[in-house]
Design a protein with these regions (language model features):
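C-terminal motif of bacterial Sec signal peptides marking the signal peptidase cleavage site
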Residues: 17-20
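Bacterial signal peptide processing site
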Residues: 22-24
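Short, low-complexity, disordered segments immediately C-terminal to signal peptides
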Residues: 26-36
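A short beta-strand micro-motif
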Residues: 36-49, 144-154
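Post-signal-peptide N-terminal segment of Sec-exported extracytoplasmic proteins
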Residues: 41-75
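Mature extracytoplasmic domains of secretory-pathway proteins
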Residues: 60-72, 110-174
Length: 202
């Protein structure tokens, strides 16, 4: 009985690791960011997409600064702080307001490749509810070939990223999105963005 349980457990672990499950990969990425930090570059931009500042490091982590959370009548945190706490090595930076993009080493801004205005027309018939279900499944398990076009808060083009296995995830900080692009983390704060299936733009 114990042997059968052990074999089942080992097969399950092997299957999970072989499928490249995005959810599992996100969990490991989050754990690595929390305990070791990620090798990342963080850039902030003004409303016209002009670079304000840039910071890079081998041990970088971004989270919501809980000190700025508001509380309800019972004293419970609403977890609504818009202030980001950036840990860069042994230093801390607080950021709020301007657009921010943090890219893990290995990601490449492909803005010049996709800087034209997207004009998409698709005339095939489909079942929207089924498409959403399939897309949600792929987001959790395999990711999809996507292009992310990012704009500043006033709509000025800022950056573009593309990947074969892209999945979108929520962040604990308001106005912040986290993406996993081919195993690398991308954090987008206070930016407009559109995520396209890559085939639509190629």
């Amino acid at each position: 009985m114990k042997k059968r349980y052990l074999i089942t457990l080992l097969i399950s672990i092997a299957l999970l690791s072989l499928t490249g499950c995005q959810s599992v990969e996100k969990w490991f990425k989050n754990a690595k960011e929390e305990w070791l930090g990620l090798e990342m570059t963080v850039r902030t931009y003004d409303e016209n997409s002009q670079l304000i500042d840039q910071m890079s490091g081998k041990s970088l982590s971004i989270s919501r600064n809980e000190e700025f959370d508001s509380v309800d009548a019972e004293g419970n945190s609403k977890e609504d702080s818009s202030v980001l706490k950036i840990t860069l090595g042994k230093y801390e930076i607080d950021h709020v307001g301007s657009s921010l993009i943090a890219e893990e080493k290995g990601l490449k801004d492909v803005f010049s490749q996709y800087q034209k205005t997207a004009d998409v027309e698709e005339n095939s018939h489909a079942v929207p509810v089924l498409n959403r279900m399939i897309s949600a499944f792929k987001n959790e398990f395999t990711g999809k070939k996507k292009v992310i076009l990012i704009r500043s808060q006033n709509g000025t083009p800022l950056a573009a990223y593309a990947g074969d296995r892209v999945s979108l995830d929520k962040s604990d900080a308001p106005k912040t999105s986290e993406l996993l692009i081919d195993g690398k983390r991308l954090v987008i704060y206070r930016c407009d963005y559109t995520i396209y299936d890559r085939e639509l733009l190629e």
